[in-house]
């Protein structure tokens, strides 16, 4: 299944706020309508919607998310927690968390168009897994810095997660540590996502 490229508001109206996909929020009252329908939803539907929430927020294909679930299942620790950590440490998501891109699709474009350096080298793979002590910077070209400056100028400055440090005047971000999954900030039950895939096999 390919990455979703359809109307974004349609998705947040059904699944709730997905800050990685779009900065838009559902209209007031839509959460109440969703809650009123929740009593009619089957357990399968609930697990499916949690999976879709995760997939659309991080902008993943079905195959990509399944691969991440498999990797998390083989790692030490709770599978759901490891899954969130893997997704949060993707380069496109790190750029989004740093505020160098307004959405994860926007961050992916920066990476694909070779505007981003990691430790001084161009990285054009959005799924690149960042590590503690990685240094993420805008490319040296004026266009690269202008694109990120536009985001800085137009976005509200939200509190950074503790695992990241931003030096905006240098167009530089630092990865201090692996993210604590409690900080993810997405209303998601990752255990239901793991359950969804465990019941598919």
UniProtKB/Swiss-Prot annotation:
<dbReference type="GO" id="GO:0019843">
    <property type="term" value="F:rRNA binding"/>
</dbReference>
<dbReference type="GO" id="GO:0006412">
    <property type="term" value="P:translation"/>
</dbReference>
<dbReference type="InterPro" id="IPR001912">
    <property type="entry name" value="Ribosomal_uS4_N"/>
</dbReference>
<feature type="domain" description="S4 RNA-binding">
    <location>
        <begin position="89"/>
        <end position="149"/>
    </location>
</feature>
<dbReference type="InterPro" id="IPR022801">
    <property type="entry name" value="Ribosomal_uS4"/>
</dbReference>
<dbReference type="InterPro" id="IPR005709">
    <property type="entry name" value="Ribosomal_uS4_bac-type"/>
</dbReference>
<dbReference type="GO" id="GO:0009507">
    <property type="term" value="C:chloroplast"/>
</dbReference>
<keyword id="KW-0934">Plastid</keyword>
<dbReference type="InterPro" id="IPR018079">
    <property type="entry name" value="Ribosomal_uS4_CS"/>
</dbReference>
<keyword id="KW-0694">RNA-binding</keyword>
<keyword id="KW-0150">Chloroplast</keyword>
<comment type="function">
    <text>With S5 and S12 plays an important role in translational accuracy.</text>
</comment>
<dbReference type="Pfam" id="PF00163">
    <property type="entry name" value="Ribosomal_S4"/>
</dbReference>
<comment type="function">
    <text>One of the primary rRNA binding proteins, it binds directly to 16S rRNA where it nucleates assembly of the body of the 30S subunit.</text>
</comment>
<comment type="similarity">
    <text>Belongs to the universal ribosomal protein uS4 family.</text>
</comment>
<feature type="region of interest" description="Disordered">
    <location>
        <begin position="20"/>
        <end position="43"/>
    </location>
</feature>
<dbReference type="Pfam" id="PF01479">
    <property type="entry name" value="S4"/>
</dbReference>
<keyword id="KW-0699">rRNA-binding</keyword>
<dbReference type="InterPro" id="IPR036986">
    <property type="entry name" value="S4_RNA-bd_sf"/>
</dbReference>
<dbReference type="GO" id="GO:0042274">
    <property type="term" value="P:ribosomal small subunit biogenesis"/>
</dbReference>
<protein>
    <recommendedName>
        <fullName>Small ribosomal subunit protein uS4c</fullName>
    </recommendedName>
</protein>
<keyword id="KW-0687">Ribonucleoprotein</keyword>
<dbReference type="GO" id="GO:0003735">
    <property type="term" value="F:structural constituent of ribosome"/>
</dbReference>
<keyword id="KW-0689">Ribosomal protein</keyword>
<dbReference type="GO" id="GO:0015935">
    <property type="term" value="C:small ribosomal subunit"/>
</dbReference>
<comment type="subunit">
    <text>Part of the 30S ribosomal subunit. Contacts protein S5. The interaction surface between S4 and S5 is involved in control of translational fidelity.</text>
</comment>
<dbReference type="InterPro" id="IPR002942">
    <property type="entry name" value="S4_RNA-bd"/>
</dbReference>
């Amino acid at each position: 299944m390919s990455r979703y490229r359809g109307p974004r508001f349609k998705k947040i109206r059904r699944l709730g706020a997905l800050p990685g996909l779009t900065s838009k929020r559902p209209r007031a009252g839509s959460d109440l309508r969703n809650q009123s329908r929740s009593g009619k939803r089957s357990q399968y539907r609930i697990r499916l919607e949690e999976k879709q929430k995760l997939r659309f927020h991080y902008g993943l294909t079905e195959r990509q998310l399944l691969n991440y679930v498999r990797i998390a299942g083989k790692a030490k620790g709770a599978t759901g927690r490891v899954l969130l950590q893997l997704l949060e440490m993707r380069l496109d998501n790190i750029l989004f968390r740093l505020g160098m891109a307004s959405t994860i699709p926007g961050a992916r474009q920066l990476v694909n168009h070779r505007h981003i350096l990691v430790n001084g080298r161009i990285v054009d793979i959005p799924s690149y897994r960042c590590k503690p002590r990685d240094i993420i910077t805008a490319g040296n070209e004026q266009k690269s810095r202008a694109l990120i400056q536009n985001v800085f100028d137009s976005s509200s400055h939200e509190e950074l997660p503790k695992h990241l440090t931003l030096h905006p005047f240098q167009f530089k971000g630092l990865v201090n540590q692996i993210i604590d999954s409690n900080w993810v900030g997405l209303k998601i039950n990752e255990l239901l996502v793991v359950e969804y895939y465990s019941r598919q096999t």
